Amino acid sequence: AASQHLCGSHLVEALFLVCGESGFFYNPNKSGIVEQCCLKPCTIYEMEKYCN
């Protein structure tokens, strides 16, 4: 999977696609996924860690 930078609404949309029905844990105050996917590029595998 290609790594990509995803920020804000793009990141949320990508999480919806990756996690599907199970949903995901997104808390902008806990910057984990933002640091992993916005400041640095991340892969789908890294995003899956944030699914519920």
UniProtKB/Swiss-Prot annotation:
Keyword Cell membrane applies: no
Compartments where located: Secreted
InterPro entries: Insulin, Insulin-like, Insulin-like_sf, Insulin_CS, Insulin_family
Pfam families linked to this entry: Insulin
Keyword Disulfide bond attributed: yes
S-S bonds: 7-38, 19-51, 37-42
GO terms, biological process: glucose metabolic process
Family according to the record: Belongs to the insulin family.
Subunit: Heterodimer of a B chain and an A chain linked by two disulfide bonds.
PANTHER family: INSULIN, INSULIN/INSULIN GROWTH FACTOR
Record's protein name: Insulin
Native organism: Amia calva
